[in-house]
């Protein structure tokens, strides 16, 4: 049994989702969004770090799963997204959590069955898979998708290897 924290990074809104994996069963523990009130990027990065650290303290996850940066036509947006990811990852590493990264297409495929799914499809499937009473916010649904993707990927790796994947705690690779 493990608790997985999923993160959908963003420089203005960072989504988070927490699930418990017990064998094949996934249980919803919580989700939401960290909304940045700071205007300047350094202040927003500090808010991401503090927010993710608080979530880690509250839920005590065993694993941290985060969406990878995608290549954007706007280089400035991609750089800001990378910095937001870095703030969240540092919070996880400081808590000695193993960090796993997943491409957005892989997360969408794990949740909806297709890598080209839109946000509403991800929301609908996350709601269905976790038996939620209502659709989660889009960024929170993406974060829950990252956690679900890790749970499914981890189960597959364990089945293929016949044992745990051997990730080292607190090591970012």
UniProtKB/Swiss-Prot annotation:
What function does this protein fulfil? The RuvA-RuvB-RuvC complex processes Holliday junction (HJ) DNA during genetic recombination and DNA repair. Endonuclease that resolves HJ intermediates. Cleaves cruciform DNA by making single-stranded nicks across the HJ at symmetrical positions within the homologous arms, yielding a 5'-phosphate and a 3'-hydroxyl group; requires a central core of homology in the junction. The consensus cleavage sequence is 5'-(A/T)TT(C/G)-3'. Cleavage occurs on the 3'-side of the TT dinucleotide at the point of strand exchange.
First-level EC class: hydrolase
Cite a single GO BP annotation.
DNA repair
Q: Which residues bind Mg(2+) 2?
A: 67
Q: Which reaction does this chain catalyze?
A: Endonucleolytic cleavage at a junction such as a reciprocal single-stranded crossover between two homologous DNA duplexes (Holliday junction)
| Cofactor(s) it depends on | Mg(2+)
- Disulfide bridge positions per record: none
Oligomeric form and interacting partners: Homodimer which binds Holliday junction (HJ) DNA. The HJ becomes 2-fold symmetrical on binding to RuvC with unstacked arms; it has a different conformation from HJ DNA in complex with RuvA. In the full resolvosome a probable DNA-RuvA(4)-RuvB(12)-RuvC(2) complex forms which resolves the HJ.
Q: What subcellular locations does the record give?
A: Cytoplasm
Q: Which PROSITE patterns match?
A: RUVC (PS01321)
CDD domains documented for this protein: RuvC
What's the family? Belongs to the RuvC family.
Q: Give the Pfam families listed for this entry.
A: RuvC
InterPro entries according to UniProt: RNaseH-like_sf, RNaseH_sf, X-over_junc_endoDNase_Mg_BS, X-over_junc_endoDNase_RuvC
Give the UniProt keywords, A-Z. Cytoplasm, DNA damage, DNA recombination, DNA repair, DNA-binding, Endonuclease, Hydrolase, Magnesium, Metal-binding, Nuclease
**Which protein are we looking at?**
Crossover junction endodeoxyribonuclease RuvC
**Per the UniProt entry, what species is this protein from, by scientific name?**
Aliivibrio fischeri (strain ATCC 700601 / ES114) (Vibrio fischeri)
- Residues annotated as binding Mg(2+) 1: 8, 139
How is the cofactor bound, in the record's words? Binds 2 Mg(2+) ion per subunit.
């Amino acid at each position: 049994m493990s608790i997985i924290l999923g993160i959908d990074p963003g420089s203005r809104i960072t989504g988070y989702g927490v699930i418990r994996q017990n064998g094949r069963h996934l249980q919803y523990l919580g989700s939401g969004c960290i909304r940045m009130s700071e205007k300047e990027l350094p202040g927003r990065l500090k808010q991401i770090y503090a927010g993710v650290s608080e979530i880690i303290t509250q839920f005590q996850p065993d694993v941290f799963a985060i969406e990878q940066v995608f290549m954007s036509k706007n280089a400035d947006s991609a750089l800001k997204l990378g910095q937001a990811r870095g703030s969240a990852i540092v919070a996880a590493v400081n808590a000695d959590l193993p960090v796993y990264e997943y491409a957005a297409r892989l997360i969408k495929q794990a949740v909806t069955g297709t890598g080209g799914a839109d946000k509403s499809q991800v929301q609908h499937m996350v709601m269905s898979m976790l038996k939620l009473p209502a659709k989660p916010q889009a960024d929170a649904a993406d974060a829950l998708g990252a956690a679900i993707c890790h749970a499914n990927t981890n189960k597959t790796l364990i089945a293929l290897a016949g044992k745990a994947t051997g990730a080292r705690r607190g090591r970012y690779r």
